[in-house]
Amino acid sequence: VDISTDKGFFLFIGLVQQMLDLLPKQLFLFDPLSLFFLLVIFIISLPSAIYSLGYLKGEYPFSKILLSWLLLVVFILSMAAVVSVGNVLIFLVAWEIMSLVSYFLVVFDTTHEKSIQAGTLYIIMTHIGTAFLIAAFMMLYQYSKSFDFLTMKNAAVAIPAQTKNIIFILLLVGFGTKAGIVPLHIWLPYAHPQAPSHISSIMSGVMIKTAIYGIIRFVMFILGVNSSWWGVSVLILAMISCLVGVIY
């Protein structure tokens, strides 16, 4: 009986150890890049939140105003999490929360059919982008066997150049969809005008910038620039996006 008890105890310890190994070893990553984006998030979100007090008052019942504020708080915190976590799985959770909450804020005024249509287009496009990100992250995981940023960065040196090119394209499409880079911008001119003014300002001023953070973090910090055509392609897409933005 004692032997079986000991075996059971050690099996239990082994199971607990395996479960602990699955947990992120580095939950947060605070460096100049993340701190800069955190500063931008809170500097822009705070006045927008204050503005919403007067904007929503008189337009909606108190219960709906309270719901709006709860969604807004979750929205801001999820954006802060996106730029400060150090693990891909936690990053994806924060990214998904940010996307879903921003969708509910876009369709906040359910009496307008255009809001529903804009929100539907937005949520479809954002999940297409997320699918590309998941594919890129899984390719990185094949080499790192870990979802922690620093481990992925160290393992990225062993990734073949051709594979790095594929991962770069997946990341560019995934984050480019959220950033509104042409031609992945089709959701942006519909969703932003339909969202309440304070939400539109946060989405355009902060949320789409989290995608820029993602490109910098995963392409430059983790993957490592592999070829000059990466920078050239980003520059060309940025110039085209600027031109289309001016025309709009």
State the predicted function of each range.
Residues 26-40, 81-93, 230:
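Membrane-entry segments of alpha-helical transmembrane domains in multi-pass membrane proteins
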